[in-house]
């Protein structure tokens, strides 16, 4: 297991595996409003996937793992998108700050993330160990 990190596996496979792990573990609590909320002003509908909250949490955990520290504002920019304005030129709209904030708070509550002294969040030692363990299991399954 030494030397295996999240960078060594495919992003989509890792996100799906970690989302399944988060759902299976049952430690992460989801808000009641996740089935009706949009993920940003640029979206017209709520997500179709009933497990989208776990997938978003896994993607955010991977995103923060690959960087030193990330704030909620940066996550809003990452998960934003282009707004449909008809014939007019499209513009970027940030994703929902509430969704990103609640996901980060959920990950912080289960010990994957911790607050950084410089602002934002960073991956904790326990979180890094969990993510590396998932990455190692994916590499084992591949071989």
Swiss-Prot record:
Locations listed in the record: Cytoplasm; Nucleus
Entry-linked SMART domains: Ribosomal_S19e (SM01413)
Source taxon at top rank: Eukaryota
Pfam family, one: Ribosomal_S19e
Record keywords, A-Z: Cytoplasm, Nucleus, Ribonucleoprotein, Ribosomal protein
GO biological process: cytoplasmic translation; ribosomal small subunit assembly
GO molecular function annotation: RNA binding; structural constituent of ribosome
Keyword set includes Isomerase: no
GO CC entries: cytosol; cytosolic small ribosomal subunit; nucleus
Main subcellular localisation: cytoplasm
Keyword Metal-binding recorded: no
InterPro entries: Ribosomal_eS19 (IPR001266), Ribosomal_eS19_CS (IPR018277), WH-like_DNA-bd_sf (IPR036388), WH_DNA-bd_sf (IPR036390)
Other remarks on this protein: There are 2 genes for eS19 in S.pombe.
Assigned protein family: Belongs to the eukaryotic ribosomal protein eS19 family.
Biological role: Component of the ribosome, a large ribonucleoprotein complex responsible for the synthesis of proteins in the cell. The small ribosomal subunit (SSU) binds messenger RNAs (mRNAs) and translates the encoded message by selecting cognate aminoacyl-transfer RNA (tRNA) molecules. The large subunit (LSU) contains the ribosomal catalytic site termed the peptidyl transferase center (PTC), which catalyzes the formation of peptide bonds, thereby polymerizing the amino acids delivered by tRNAs into a polypeptide chain.
Record note on quaternary structure: Component of the small ribosomal subunit (SSU). Mature yeast ribosomes consist of a small (40S) and a large (60S) subunit. The 40S small subunit contains 1 molecule of ribosomal RNA (18S rRNA) and at least 33 different proteins. The large 60S subunit contains 3 rRNA molecules (25S, 5.8S and 5S rRNA) and at least 46 different proteins.
Protein name from the UniProt record: Small ribosomal subunit protein eS19B
Organism: Schizosaccharomyces pombe (strain 972 / ATCC 24843)
Gene this protein is translated from: rps1902
């Amino acid at each position: 297991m030494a030397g295996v990190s999240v960078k060594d596996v495919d992003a989509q496979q890792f996100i799906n595996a970690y989302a399944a792990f988060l759902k299976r573990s049952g430690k992460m609590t989801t808000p009641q409003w996740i089935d009706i909320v949009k993920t940003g002003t640029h979206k017209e509908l709520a997500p179709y996937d009933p497990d989208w909250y776990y997938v978003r949490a896994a993607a955010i955990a991977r995103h923060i793992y690959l960087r030193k520290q990330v704030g909620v504002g940066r996550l809003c920019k990452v998960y934003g998108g282009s707004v449909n304005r008809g014939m007019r030129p499209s513009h970027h709209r940030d994703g929902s700050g509430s969704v990103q904030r609640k996901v980060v708070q959920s990950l912080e509550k289960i010990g994957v993330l911790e607050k950084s002294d410089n602002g934002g969040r960073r991956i904790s030692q326990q979180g890094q160990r969990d993510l590396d363990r998932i990455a190692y299991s994916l590499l084992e399954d591949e071989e």
